[in-house]
Curated annotation (Swiss-Prot):
The gene is pepA. Mn(2+) 1 binds at D270, D347, E349. This is Probable cytosol aminopeptidase. NCBIfam families: PRK00913.1-2, PRK00913.1-4, PRK00913.2-2, PRK00913.2-4, PRK00913.3-5. It comes from Rickettsia bellii (strain OSU 85-389). The active site is at K277, R351.
Length: 502
């Protein structure tokens, strides 16, 4: 993990110094002094607008002409219009800086920031820049044994001086704890499915959360059978690896205060079962457990901060595999709620896992609200692409709060429709419901949401986040490499902190 330290200006001792310049290209007195120390290098660079214009996100690394001293490079970072800067933009700028200096093989970087930028104090800006750099420093290359040393390069340290280092440190320490939740989510999601079997995944959850005073229970197939979880167990019955239900209970306030329940789909690998998927890109189905990973990452972020809230996380961990024991299209399963479901397509398995998991969470913990997170449907990818996750909810206020939190951390949600017509589409001729709609190709995300909605008890606020399009990316972003994004951790942490702290 990138080492970040807030220190006094005279203690800065780094190979590169970051310089913020907006699109007006005017240097304040501090930058004029720095420019003079470096023989006009900054002013000469910005005078040539072909080299640097100050637009947001532009990074220009220039070697220092001063032979003495530690600073070998100046890193010009464009702010664009200061009036348009947001927390998201500042944080992403930190990520862009880290990525550029990593490519330039610069081991230590420094930043001096004493003045306000737009509406933000220097300590606030510094914490956001450091947070973005930290998130962007993430790597998952432990299985790459032939990497050249040059390709293993990482930035070692980030030294920052502000007008209030104590405040900057306090702000950043919170963001660092959240990043640890994001990194766990990315790590476990990126793991190959042969490495993260349900048992191994469950053990990793227990190992990290029990150190944070979270009670973790792992239910095996015998316990789930006794509870009547026929839907979840049916999905995993074709696999040699036993299905698990992991229950994470965090009490940060009065035990009588209501719980928030976070429920995650954890399909460790999804072949589609007997309704087998095409082989093209099937390897990406290792990411079909990203909803569960987001729930665990959120529990880490909340518990490590010791937030004064009560939260339970429930994740169903299964493998959807074809075999002689696998569930067949046309099978009928009885859920923990007592309702029955006809499995018309074994590749619509996530909603079956969630049906039993959300019911268990409600029966055991009586939560005020339930939020489930799942890479549930390809239809949501068609609808929203890689920009938004879909948000379905039976409560307008809950949906609005989630959407607001998502905007604040750039994990965007788009409200999607629920309607009685969609609910009618999942009626079955031989069971209480079917696991796919009866109009081929129509409203697949909404019918999936309605399936889950049938397991939400009266009076419980509920939201379903379909993250299939945003959970993993085939290209890098400002805050991380391609692969698992860690989507949902920062969104849910922000939502919980803004709405449920006692």
């Amino acid at each position: 993990m990138l080492h970040v330290n807030f220190t006094e200006e005279e203690s800065l001792n780094t190979q590169a110094l970051i310089v913020f310049i907006d699109d007006k290209l005017k240097l304040d007195s501090e930058l004029i002094n720095l420019d003079q120390q470096h023989h006009g290098l900054i002013s000469k660079t910005i005078a040539n607008k072909l080299q640097f214009t100050g637009k947001y996100g532009q990074i220009k690394i220039i070697p220092s002409v001063v032979k003495s001293g530690e600073v070998k490079y100046l890193v010009l970072a464009g702010l664009g219009s200061e009036e348009k800067l947001t927390e998201v933009k500042i944080e992403e700028l930190g990520g862009k800086i880290l990525q550029n200096v990593t490519n330039a093989k610069i081991a230590t970087i420094g930043l001096k920031i004493k003045n306000r930028i737009s509406n933000f104090t220097s300590s606030h800006v510094a914490s956001l820049i450091a947070s973005g750099a930290l998130l962007a420093s993430y790597r998952f290359d432990k299985y790459r044994t032939t990497l050249k040393e040059a390709d293993k390069f990482v930035v070692e340290s980030f030294e920052i001086s502000t007008d209030n280092n104590a405040e900057a440190t306090k702000l950043f320490e919170v963001k660092k704890l959240i990043a640890e939740g994001v990194f766990f989510t990315r790590d476990i999601s990126n793991e190959p499915s042969n490495i993260k079997t349900p048992q191994i995944y469950a053990e990793r959850i227990a190992d990290i959360l029990e150190e944070l005073n979270v009670d973790v229970s792992i239910l095996g197939e015998r316990e789930m059978k006794n509870l009547g979880m026929g839907a979840l167990l049916g999905v995993g019955q074709g696999s040699q690896n036993e299905s698990k239900l992991v229950v994470m209970e965090y009490q940060g306030t009065n035990k009588d205060a209501p719980y928030i329940a976070l429920v995650g789909k954890g399909v460790i690998f999804d072949t589609g079962g007997i309704s087998l998927k095409p082989s093209n890109n099937m390897h990406l189905m290792r990411y079909d457990m990203c909803g569960s990973a987001a729930v665990v990452g959120t529990m880490i972020a909340v518990a490590s901060q010791e937030l004064p809230v009560n939260i339970v996380g429930v994740v169903g961990l299964v493998e959807n595999m074809p075999s002689g024991n696998a569930q067949r299209p046309g099978d009928v399963v009885t859920t923990m709620s007592g309702q029955t479901a006809e499995v018309l397509n074994t590749d619509a398995e996530g909603r079956l896992v969630l049906a039993d998991a959300v019911w268990y969470a409600q029966e055991k913990f009586k939560p005020k609200c339930v939020i489930d997170v799942a890479t549930l449907t390809g239809a949501i990818v068609v609808s929203l692409g890689p920009t938004y996750a879909g948000c379905f909810s039976n409560n307008d206020e809950l949906a609005d709060k989630l959407i607001k939190a998502g905007e604040e951390v750039n994990e965007k949600l788009w409200r999607m429709p629920l309607h009685e017509d969609y609910d009618a589409m999942i009626n079955s001729d031989i069971a209480d419901m079917a696991n796919i709609g009866n109009v081929p190709g129509a409203a697949g995300s909404s019918t999936a949401a309605h399936f889950i909605k049938r397991f939400i008890q009266e009076g419980v606020e509920w939201a379903h986040l379909d993250i299939a399009g945003v959970a993993n990316s085939n290209k890098p972003s400002s805050l991380g490499p391609k692969g698992a994004v860690g989507y949902g951790v920062r969104l849910l942490e922000k939502f919980i902190k803004e709405n449920y702290e006692q």
